[in-house]
């Protein structure tokens, strides 16, 4: 059996160290996409350039717009070149750690931010960004109707525009369980069952974005009075913690392409398309959709932008088909525009949960640090 495991970008690690900011001028250089990125990804040239801005006067804008984002931002050069061609605006990308670091940097700057647009604030940190007054109101005129379900509640919807969506879910190595004649797990409770002792690995909640999402999933599932007891049962059942997703998936997970011995891992609903058996054309892994926690990424115009019209045009561009169509195979997330065709392997093996676990962003903002301290007490005990 020949298994092809295609590496995906490292997920967004939570802030644990200093912040390095790298600036890429997309008018002149490549974003350095992974060599294993599929060549079949739709090109920006496949879409009409006028879609790139949402403004009839876009070509007259000109200048530069500074985009502050996270380190996992991976958009082909030609995609943003389409925006530049349509608007005359050059996009200067500045990366700043993960989603948590991104928000922290902007909040600590206290309005003194040399940027125009932010992309990559996720639903976990959105309320903090809105409450800090970081964002100017803007709603794209051509926002897809399907994006409305991902909007933040209340006035926050005017500040941040949903761009992509993904589910963090428990993934299993189907081949491992089939070869041993073992019934695969299906639920959170199964992970704490002695039948699955020493089989689960997850990135830690304090050092990893998917790890935090899994913690939040357990809070949503078991409630504020029950999640810590569940975690105690997980640890008593031999759960292994890693510092990040990449170690959990590529080192410890049996289907991660290494020598791992754990057939259950915290990953993404979009992971199965990247573990396809080249002989059968079938994925050897699956996501347990009843364990999924929904994450939405947003973009917004920053208050104090030096080029607000161009900033608004860039946010508009991010919900256009030109940008939405490159998300699955470049950033491994689902577009919020459900009219965009997904790659064939995504259509077959990637699926968003029908009823994902979610917590109100404000509730997360108010309790995140407390939950993390309590989590560390459990796993460190």
Question: What is the role of each PLM region?
Answer:
Residues 29-33, 46, 51-128, 254-257:
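Early extracytoplasmic/lumenal segment of secretory-pathway proteins
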Residues 123-134, 155-183, 211-221, 296-300:
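Periplasmic solute-binding protein
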Residues 113-118, 136-172, 189, 199-205:
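A structural signal for short loop-to-beta-strand junctions that line the ligand-binding cleft
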Residues 24-28:
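C-terminal motif of bacterial Sec signal peptides marking the signal peptidase cleavage site
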Residues 136-144, 160-161, 189, 276-293, ...:
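Short beta-strand->loop
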Residues 210, 216-290:
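Ligand-binding pocket segment of bilobal, Venus flytrap-like solute-binding proteins
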Residues 195-206, 317-341:
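Periplasmic-binding protein-like
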Residues 171-176, 295-310, 318, 326-330:
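A bilobed periplasmic-binding-protein/Venus flytrap-type ligand-binding module shared by bacterial periplasmic
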């Amino acid at each position: 059996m020949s298994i092809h495991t295609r590496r995906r970008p490292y997920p967004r690690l939570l802030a644990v160290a200093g912040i390095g900011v790298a600036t890429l001028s997309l008018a002149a250089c490549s974003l350095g996409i992974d060599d294993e990125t599929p060549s079949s990804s739709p090109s920006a040239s496949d879409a009409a350039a006028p879609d790139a801005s949402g403004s009839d006067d876009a070509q007259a804008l000109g200048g530069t717009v500074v985009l502050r984002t996270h380190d996992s931002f991976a958009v082909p050069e030609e995609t943003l070149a389409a925006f530049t061609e349509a608007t005359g605006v050059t996009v200067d990308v500045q990366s700043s750690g993960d989603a948590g670091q991104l928000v922290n940097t902007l909040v600590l700057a206290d309005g003194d931010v040399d940027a125009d647009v932010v992309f990559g604030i996720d639903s976990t940190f959105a309320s903090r960004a809105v409450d800090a007054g970081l964002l100017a109101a803007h709603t794209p005129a051509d926002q897809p109707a399907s994006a409305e379900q991902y909007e933040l509640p209340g006035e926050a919807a005017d500040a941040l525009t949903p761009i992509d969506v993904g589910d963090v879910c428990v993934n299993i190595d189907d081949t491992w369980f089939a070869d041993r004649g073992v019934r695969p797990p299906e639920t959170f409770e199964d992970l704490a069952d002695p039948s699955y002792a020493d089989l689960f690995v997850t990135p830690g909640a304090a050092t990893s974005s998917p790890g935090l999402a899994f913690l939040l999933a357990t809070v949503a599932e078991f409630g504020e009075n029950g999640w810590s007891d569940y975690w105690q049962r997980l640890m008593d059942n031999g759960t292994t913690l890693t510092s990040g997703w990449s170690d959990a998936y590529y080192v410890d997970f049996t289907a991660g392409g290494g020598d791992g011995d754990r057939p259950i891992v915290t990953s993404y609903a979009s992971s199965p398309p990247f573990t396809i058996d080249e002989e059968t054309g079938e994925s050897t892994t699956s996501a347990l959709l009843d364990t999924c926690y929904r994450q939405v990424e947003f973009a917004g115009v920053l208050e104090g932008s030096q080029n607000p019209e161009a900033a608004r045009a860039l946010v508009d561009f991010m919900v256009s088909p030109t940008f939405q169509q490159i998300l699955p195979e470049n950033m491994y997330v689902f577009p919020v525009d459900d009219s965009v065709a997904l790659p064939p392997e995504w259509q077959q093996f990637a699926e968003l949960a029908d009823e994902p676990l979610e917590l109100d962003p404000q509730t997360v903002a108010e309790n995140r640090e407390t939950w993390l301290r309590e989590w560390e007490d459990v796993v460190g005990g």
